[in-house]
C-alpha cells in the first residue's frame, strides 16, 4: 500500500465515523419523535401526531443534507431548512407540554422559547443576516431532556392510557 493510500485512509476514517454518528442521531430523532407522540397523545392526539411528523421531516431533511456534505454551503442551507421544521416541532412540543397537566408549565414555555431560535435563525440566514439567537434559547430543550430522565419514569401511568 502506498503512503498516499495510507494517508487517504487515515483521513477518511474520521469522516466515516462522523457520518455514522450523524446517522445514529437521525435514527434517535425518529425514535424520540415516536416516543414523544405516545407521551403527549393524551393531551391531543392530532397535535401530538403533527409534532412528531415535523421531527421526522426534520430527520429526513437532515439525511438529505448529508448528500451535499461535499458542498458545505448547500449542506448548511438544507440543514437550515430542517431547523425550521425542528423549530415547529419544538413549538408544538412546548404547547403540548404546557397544556399536559402532568409536566411543568414552565418547561413548556422554555421549549416554546427554544423553538424561536430554530425558526428565526435560519430565516435570518436565508435573508442574509448572520444573527444567532438560538445559542440563547436552547435551554428549554436541554432542561426537557434532563426532566424526562429524572422525572419521566413517573409518567408511565399517564402514557399507558390509550
Curated annotation (Swiss-Prot):
GO terms for cellular component: plasma membrane. The keyword rRNA-binding does not apply. It comes from the Archaea. It is a multi-pass membrane protein. The chain crosses the membrane at residues 15-40, 47-66, 76-98, 105-124, 128-150. Pfam families: DUF4386. The keyword Transmembrane applies. Its main location: membrane. Keywords: Cell membrane, Membrane, Transmembrane, Transmembrane helix. InterPro entries: DUF4386. It is found in: Cell membrane. This is Uncharacterized protein AF_2041.
